[in-house]
Amino acid sequence: MPAVQLLLLACLLGGVGARTAQFQKANDRSGRCQYTFSVASPSESSCPEQGQAMLAIQELQRDSSEQRATLESTKARLSSLEALLHRLTSGQPAGPLETHQGLQRELEALRREREQLETQTQELESAYSNLVRDKSALEEEKRRLQAENEDLARRLESSSQEVASLRRGQCPQAHSSSQDVPSGSREVAKWNLENMDFQELKSELTEVPASQILKESPSGHPRNEEGGTGCGELVWVGEPITLRTAETITGKYGVWMRDPRAAFPYTGETTWRIDTVGTDIRQVFEYDHIRKFTQGYPSKVHVLPRPLESTGAVVYRGSLYFQAAESRTVLRYDLRTETLKAEKEIPGAGYHGQFPYSWGGYTDIDLAVDEIGLWVIYSTEAAKGAIVLSKLNPETLELEQTWETNIRKQSVANAFIICGTLYTVSSYSSPDATVNFAYDTGTGSSKALTVPFKNRYKYSSMIDYNPLERKLFAWDNFNMVSYDIKLSRL
């Protein structure tokens, strides 16, 4: 119907334009009045037939559909423009409309960022959990150490009170007199607890210098009051006993020691340990008790003011003696005050790989302790690589006496000193090595030996003698071991 109306309107307008319009009024058959308005077609001489009218109507319908499609397209574009205008007015940066590919890329980037954030979150949570566990372990260790400290404080206070009591005057005598007791009943009266006071026994402690107990024999070995030296030639070395294993690669080589002349606050059980793999070795781990040493709980960590070199360090009379890195200087470090007390350059001594033991490791200068005192084992150009042995003053590090042996230093794996006699070990890696040479400083002579020595872990980098325990201490391929020994009587 709209199409027909448009067609009639067009005809009407055309008729008006041509000024040929006619207006008629007449009654129809039923008597009703009808008005008729006629306009001549400007382009058609006669009216079209019914089929032609339908074609015109269909064309108008197609035009209407096309106009609707155009209108929908226009609406869509208008919506896009409105969206863009909204973005511009809301402060977002202007630019071309995002394509589907752009949105996909942005979505992928957001997904990657989310995955990275999730990974970082998991790592942080894991690190936090580890820190919480470490904190709990440290707090538990702190509580344990505090409890031990309190126990030690109580024991120290008790000991102080006991010493003070012992230092007071003579104990009071019994008030009852033996004269009041008949002679025939004196033996019985001694056990009459109802009428007799008790007496306290007084105990006095007297410090005696070691020089009064140990006197040197003509050979230079220490002698006790009965005349025996307590020394002899090494005749047997027992099987190694493993006390501890290092946890990290820095513990492949190392040195561990106890003080045979310990002074307060240290005891014969206080143990020190140094891992010697690295270029800047300064940490010295201290353990109050053997149990803490075997369990791996240091009570203190010293940081040396100068780095040390290799495995030749020893502890003696409360001080750590060691070779300074890349030098022929020997240092004395006071463990109580944590300060350097003395240093001395060993004249002509090879260092940093000039005259090491056969296993290497910059073992040019090796310190040792025995019943007589502090020693240093080394070699020089003048000695042509043979072992040189010097007795050191433990306070000043001055050389007191020097011996040159006929044992080539690089031909042996390690050396130690017992009662003034130098002993060497044939191999650092063979399971069935031997103690193969002995040099007696008392007589200035050497001889070959064949005392079996076991390298259980096949890489012994340190062997030292502890005169207090009469044992050998060794570091064998991450493992800290000890050996029982036997000496023949002189």
Curated annotation (Swiss-Prot):
It comes from the Eukaryota. Residues 173-182 have a biased composition (Polar residues). Ca(2+) binds at residues 366, 414-415, 463-464. Residues 230-489 form the Olfactomedin-like domain. It is found in: Secreted; Golgi apparatus; Cytoplasmic vesicle; Secreted, Extracellular space. Residues 152-186 are annotated as: Disordered. GO terms for cellular component: cilium; collagen-containing extracellular matrix; cytoplasmic vesicle; endoplasmic reticulum; extracellular exosome; extracellular space; Golgi apparatus; mitochondrial inner membrane. The record marks 212-213 as: Cleavage. Secreted glycoprotein regulating the activation of different signaling pathways in adjacent cells to control different processes including cell adhesion, cell-matrix adhesion, cytoskeleton organization and cell migration. Promotes substrate adhesion, spreading and formation of focal contacts. Negatively regulates cell-matrix adhesion and stress fiber assembly through Rho protein signal transduction. Modulates the organization of actin cytoskeleton by stimulating the formation of stress fibers through interactions with components of Wnt signaling pathways. This is Myocilin. It comes from Bos taurus (Bovine).
